[in-house]
Amino acid sequence: MSGHSKFANIKHKKEKNDAAKGKIFTIIGREIAVAVKEGGPDPSNNFKLAQVIAKAKSNNMPNDTIERGIKKAAGDGNSVNYEFCTYKGYGPSGTAIIVKCLTDNKNRTAANVRNAFTKGHGSIGTQGCVSYMFDEKGQIIIAKEDCEMDADDLMMIALDAGAEDFNEEEDCFEVLTSPDDFEAVRSALEAENIPMAEAEVTMIPQNYVELSADEDITNINRILDLLDDDDDVQQVYHNWDE
């Protein structure tokens, strides 16, 4: 792999997350509540909850906070009902953007997302307009500076657990899985005490779009910043080659 430093992107995202950790924890708390209501409080029998817990751990959410969130969701029948919704559209120069939200008011969320695209001279598209440009994969990033294990041994653990691919970059290792095999692979790495800088099911662009015009870069950053500031937005995926 070349041209896209996964760990550099993760570090950049972590820096932004650390500046708004309260928001990140609130977002994950909502996801925990929805996952528990849909599938129960036992992550061994609730794949969605297991995924959210993995996301929480990769964002350094304390275990007691995770456990409190699960217990609260399991015992609270009067909490706010949140719904997942997804918006897809285009940024400058045909960049593709997918926005995943968790909201208690779809009308509010739709208006806010549309406003973000409009202010960055982008547009919301039809429901399936950019999906074909991404692959849904489990992605685990392991920083070399945090991992003492030999690359070959690490690769064997991942592949034996069901990983589809193992890639090495200058600063990190990337493990890719199918969404269904993600938790098994993540658990296998965790059992070996392998530190993971990122572990989640994500949307990976098949190709990246380079933006050279300053106006395009300003506009896509405006879209992404407005979406990042929206409490209803859970995750944003794009194919801009930052």
Give the location of each predicted region:
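N-terminal cationic and glycine-rich segments that engage phosphates or anionic surfaces
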Residues: 1-125, 129-141, 238-241
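Positively charged, low-complexity, intrinsically disordered RNA-binding extensions
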Residues: 139-242
